[in-house]
């Protein structure tokens, strides 16, 4: 029996989940937010209890110390020695990493080198890795990459139609993201359908604050909507998704507040999407409240959101030459019945039909009618469990 922590570290946050392995039992979970500020928030959930404290956490090293000390303080572990492994979610692995790896100095350097591919994610993840290696130097640390699952895409799919020297010299290509989630929910969908994954054609829709759609052919990713960075694809919570790239120099020339390409990319990443269009919120619950109030900006943002998701799903029906099931997952995918209904209603030509009695908040499983030719499933993703499993698997290779 061992205890493994799954970590998802951002630039100012550290989300974690502690497992007892191999039983895969969640012992505790939590998040430390506002790292670097004097009013950081540490939240711990365990045994049906919730503890929350506001304190000064200046950096990721102090965040990790706080996490471990909380585990001892609340009696979840006795000593640091009970932690035998830690797994880190890394958004961008580039072409360096086709699978999860045990961390060493070179791995940390490569994660930092790939920051341009995931500027909102990789720097924070690298800081989290360094913090754990400093405080728990003797345990097995593992990196699990969002991009690994998508390394099965063929060259004609992952290359952009620009001169090939930009791929050869600078590795500009589609990498995708959310791969851990897409892989997990495809496996769970196969179990729900009672069929081998290697016989299925699935379209998996990870719809959270970040949104990505993946075409899964017999268990492998053959195309996905996120690209060189997680900015590409459908409209998202704060991200624009795909836009005409000529907009970038145009905006720099027109708007004095946007001084260079970095300013525009920051706007596209953090001030766009549902939040940017609506002017209300990036949270679908707030957008739906705006729909109820007939707020025209909320209606517009919602309609763009649905339209972009439908278009990517339609593309992947063409890529796969049909599909056995459409799978919704992640925050909105699992908890926004109205969004699911409006997406599927716009794809009825493909033979999909939702059962309104099943398409309700909290339901998991098959939400399609008996007559639906393409099944529509809601599957809870569990990226943290996938990370913990990879830690256990790789520990065996070095023991």
UniProtKB/Swiss-Prot annotation:
Report the superkingdom from the record: Bacteria
Summarize where substrate binds, as residue positions: 89
Note accompanying the cofactor annotation: Mg(2+). Can also accept Mn(2+).
Q: What is this enzyme's EC? A: 2.7.2.1
Q: Where does ATP bind?
A: 15, 206-210, 283-285, 331-335
According to its UniProt record, in which pathway does this protein act?
Metabolic intermediate biosynthesis; acetyl-CoA biosynthesis; acetyl-CoA from acetate: step 1/2
Q: Where is this site: Transition state stabilizer?
A: 178, 239
Instruction: Give the chief site where it resides.
Output: cytoplasm
Q: What is catalysed by this protein? A: acetate + ATP = acetyl phosphate + ADP
Q: Which Pfam families match?
A: Acetate_kinase
Known CDD domains for this protein?
ASKHA_NBD_AcK_PK
EC main class here is transferase
Answer whether the UniProt record assigns the keyword Metal-binding to this protein: yes
**PROSITE patterns reported for this sequence:** ACETATE_KINASE_1, ACETATE_KINASE_2
Q: Where in the cell is it found?
A: Cytoplasm
Q: Which cofactor does it need?
A: Mg(2+); Mn(2+)
Residues annotated as binding Mg(2+) are: 8, 383
Chain segments annotated as transmembrane: none
Q: List the disulfide bonds.
A: none
The active site is formed by: 146 (proton donor/acceptor)
Cited HAMAP family: Acetate_kinase (MF_00020)
Q: How does it assemble?
A: Homodimer.
Q: Which family does it belong to?
A: Belongs to the acetokinase family.
Recorded protein name is Acetate kinase
Q: Please tell me the species this chain comes from.
A: Streptococcus equi subsp. zooepidemicus (strain H70)
Q: Give the gene that encodes this protein.
A: ackA
């Amino acid at each position: 029996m061992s205890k493994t922590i799954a970590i998802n570290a951002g630039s100012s946050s550290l989300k974690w989940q502690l497992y007892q392995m191999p039983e895969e039992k969640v012992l505790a979970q939590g998040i430390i937010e506002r790292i670097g500020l004097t009013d950081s928030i540490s939240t711990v959930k365990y045994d049906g209890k919730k503890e929350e404290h506001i304190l000064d956490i200046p950096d990721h090293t102090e965040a990790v110390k706080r996490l471990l000390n909380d585990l001892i303080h609340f009696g979840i572990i006795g000593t640091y020695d009970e932690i035998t492994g830690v797994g880190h979610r890394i958004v961008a692995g580039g072409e360096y990493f086709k699978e999860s790896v045990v961390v060493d100095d070179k791995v940390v350097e490569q994660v930092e080198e790939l920051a341009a591919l995931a500027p909102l994610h990789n720097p924070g993840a690298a800081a989290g890795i360094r913090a754990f290696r400093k405080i728990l130097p003797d345990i097995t640390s593992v990196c699990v990459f969002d991009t690994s699952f998508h390394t099965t895409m063929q060259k004609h799919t992952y290359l952009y139609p620009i001169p090939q020297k930009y791929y050869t010299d600078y590795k500009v290509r589609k990498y995708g993201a959310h791969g851990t989630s897409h892989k997990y929910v495809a496996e769970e969908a196969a179990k729900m359908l009672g069929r081998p994954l290697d016989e299925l054609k699935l379209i998996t829709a990870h719809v959270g604050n970040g949104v990505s759609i993946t075409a899964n052919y017999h268990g492998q990713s053959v195309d996905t909507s996120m690209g060189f960075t997680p900015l590409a694809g459908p409209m998202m919570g704060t991200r624009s998704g795909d836009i005409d790239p000529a907009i970038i120099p145009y905006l720099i020339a027109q708007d004095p507040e946007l001084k260079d390409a970095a300013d525009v990319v920051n706007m596209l990443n953090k001030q766009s999407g549902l939040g940017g269009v609506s002017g209300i919120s990036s949270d679908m619950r707030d957008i739906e409240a705006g729909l109820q109030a007939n707020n025209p900006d909320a209606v517009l943002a919602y309609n763009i959101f649905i339209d972009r998701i439908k278009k990517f799903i339609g593309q992947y029906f063409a890529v796969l030459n049909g599909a056995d099931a459409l799978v919704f997952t992640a925050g909105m995918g699992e908890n926004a019945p109205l969004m699911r209904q409006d997406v599927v209603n716009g794809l009825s030509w493909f033979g999909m039909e939702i059962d309104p009695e099943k398409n309700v908040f909290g339901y998991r499983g098959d939400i399609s009618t008996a007559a639906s030719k393409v099944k529509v499933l809601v599957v809870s993703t569990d990226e943290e469990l996938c990370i913990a499993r990879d830690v256990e698997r790789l520990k065996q290779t070095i023991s």
